[in-house]
Amino acid sequence: MTTIRKNHPLFKAANSALIDLPAPASLSSLWNFGSLLGLCLISQIATGLFLAMHYAPETSSAFASVAHICRDVNYGWLIRNMHANGASFFFVCIYIHIGRGLYYGSYLYKETWNIGVVLLLLVMMTAFVGYVLPWGQMSFWGATVITNLLSAVPYIGESLVQWLWGGFAVDNATLTRFFAFHFLLPFVILALTLIHLIFLHETGSNNPLGLPSNSDKIPFHPYYTIKDIFGFLVLLFTLISLALFAPNLLGDPDNFTPANSMVTPAHIKPEWYFLFAYAILRSIPNKLGGVIALLCSILVLLVVPILHTSKHRSLTFRPVTQFLFWLLIADVLVLTWIGGMPVEAPYIITGQIASALYFSLFLILMPMASWVENKMLTW
């Protein structure tokens, strides 16, 4: 069996990635979230495939087809709830995964980090087009508002929006192409995930100390496979519990109303996992400025490796930057809260302060703190 595992052209690739892979001995549970993201992706593709078998991507029947799935298809309600709430769990895992990368300096593996940022953008795009498919009020108006941001692009903006819509408004052509994108993109994400892993296995994993661990490695199986399986069980138990006991907890009540272009909801907002970026978009009073800020809220992650000035890799031994890191986490939570609030005082000014702090932490405060800590090492 060992000979087949190590010599067979197919099995030896899996063996070197999942069984005999040398891994640092000190990885904490924060390193579980990469494999949990893989589980979320497989779960979303599986449930999405079954939903696509019964879904009708047509404006007159899309809303009814989702109701049909929940009422008439065997376990359709469970598949739909698993898929809708699975997206939320996907983003929880992504944000913790990125937070771990920022805290422990994993971004210094630049190729892996950059592919990860591209993956984040693709997952966000997939989730956005997926949210439009049930064709409820928030689906329709969310699609209208967010796609309309392209009109801020100078000179070609209006043409871009009409090209994306397939007409002069969000309508049947838009829904059909969004369904096509939502079906296709997860497979692109799957391919990029493999590239992400290939780059990771070129360098090996980072560890909580941020120190080279070449002298202290253990085989991935059985130590980390058991740890990952435990993580899988916790995630699946939590996801199934949410899907069974509170399936609509994270959704928007407006999406239970079929899309109506003549009635605008009182407060248009995206799903909770986009609210921090939505708050940054709204905090700029200029349309083009808001779109640029929205893009930069994600693309700022690409600048993090360039601005790393510390002599230490991880934040484990850097108390000043640690404080700023937790300030960033608090700031993102505040932005998430603001994104769900109406555009009125005191939320406007709070959102603007939180947005300014978000970019300041990444671009100014954290690099400055690293410089101060480097000086402190020489005292």
Swiss-Prot record:
This is Cytochrome b. Signal peptide: none annotated. It comes from Mugil cephalus (Flathead mullet). Component of the ubiquinol-cytochrome c reductase complex (complex III or cytochrome b-c1 complex) that is part of the mitochondrial respiratory chain. The b-c1 complex mediates electron transfer from ubiquinol to cytochrome c. Contributes to the generation of a proton gradient across the mitochondrial membrane that is then used for ATP synthesis. The cytochrome bc1 complex contains 3 respiratory subunits (MT-CYB, CYC1 and UQCRFS1), 2 core proteins (UQCRC1 and UQCRC2) and probably 6 low-molecular weight proteins. One of its GO terms (biological process) is mitochondrial electron transport, ubiquinol to cytochrome c. It is found in: Mitochondrion inner membrane. Binds 2 heme b groups non-covalently.
